Amino acid sequence: MRTVTGPTDRVIVVGAGLGGLACALHLAAAGRQVTVVEREPVPGGRAGRLAVEGYEFDTGPTVLTMPDLIAEPLAAVGEKLSDWLELTPLDPAYRAYYPDGSTLDVRTDTTRMAAEIARVCGAREADGYLRFVDFTRRLWHLERDHFIGRNLDTPVDLLNLNLLRLLGMGAFRRLQPKIGEYFRDPRTQRIFSFQAMYAGLAPHDALAIYAVIAYLDSVAGVYFPKGGMHAVPKALAGAAEKHGVTFRYDTTVERVTTAHGRATGVVTADGEHIPADVVVLNPDLPVAYRDLLPPRRSPRRLRFSPSCVVLHIGSRQPYSRIAHHNIHFGTAWKGTFDEVIRRGLLMSDPSLLVTNPTHTDASAAPDGRQTYYVLAPTPNLEAGPIDWRGGMDQRYADELLRVLERRGYVGFRDGVEVQRIITPADWADAGMAAGTPFAAAHTFGQTGPFRPSNLHPSLPNVVFTGSGTQPGVGVPMVLISGKLAAARITEVS
């Protein structure tokens, strides 16, 4: 494994996102002097918080899996997860709604889930589910330590016995045919493959190794932190500060300074130079290269994941039939992926994620009120020539609200008291390449050692963390990326 050369005592981490915070904790545990520089007044990055008229909204991820990956950087400095976060297991993890009117509750207890699938789809599907759980559990255990949890510099790093085991399991086949080995009912096929969208691919294009996302979501368990997802970066930052990490909030980094082929620190917007032995960059990787680092002669062309429109809704209207997380599938399943990913079009028959945080935590809204987070996948700004300015955002939001009312949210529009719309243009303004919060797609050529490295190719003391580098997209992967970035600094080649 390649590591940072030269002194590593003073480290600047640019950005207090989940990856940057995890990295800072691991570095503090290794005795480094760490300063985190963050442009916002609070930590969190994409896992931010929006307060509007008594309503509180998570502005980034809403699904939390694998809390042991939060516990890991805390444990590195001797802290317990339970002292910093109160987590509620969600049961069901999701409630799925299908065009035929049927529903399926996703339970993380395999016995109860098998019974639910048997009730809705029949005994054969339940048997397939149990075999699928066994497959994905083995997949996760093989991938976590030997592929996801390691710094991979070249394809040679993949060559070990576990690669042969993965090949034997069919992990490098396409996801959709692999799902078809276990499930025949389109409803179960959808609930265990829709996660491919967040890896940037349609299920028939994604590799079967990404079935681990379904494992994390629907088998390992989904949790909700008291205070919302923003409570996670608050906890990590609090623990880091307790253990000597310095935080500089409301401070924008303009560029990384270099001399003699090495980074020497960063310059802030007010002209201050902060010296460092190592610089860790948590902003979206392509944007960090574009805005903070010396220009490269031939920047790599990346393929980006789809984006999304998110509606943050504060409402008078409750719906007793829904769960915390709700997935509403449209009729046109394969066609939806084709529209969003290949053709750069908005979904003609939307599939939507509706999260109702006040279902679990009433403190997110005024008394008797509800918060809703509505996510609709859309093309990113490179794939779809959609002008989100000039009223397009409101027109599309209105269309999504009409779709929700047709799908059972009766009177939804009348109950809205607060509405905030986030579009791909807003994601781009927030510093996300191609206007997507899901970073580079997980194509074969952008996975593992082929994904952009977390070590700069010519500045040996610049390291990256976050979803744009290894191992990839999603809260669990970003937390692991922080550990991998720290290992580049603290370990010996």
Model regions: which residues?
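N-terminal glycine-rich phosphate/pyrophosphate-binding loop and immediately adjacent elements
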Residues: T5-H141
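Rossmann-like flavin
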Residues: P99-L207
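A glycine-rich dinucleotide-binding beta-alpha-beta segment and adjacent secondary-structure elements
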Residues: D185-A199, G344-T355, V410-P471
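Helical element adjacent to the flavin cofactor pocket in flavoenzyme catalytic cores
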Residues: V212-V267
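Mid-domain catalytic core of redox enzymes
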Residues: E254-P366
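Active-site-proximal substrate-binding core of FAD-dependent oxidoreductases
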Residues: T258, E491-S493
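C-terminal segments that line or cap access tunnels to active or ligand-binding sites in enzymes
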Residues: R316-A428
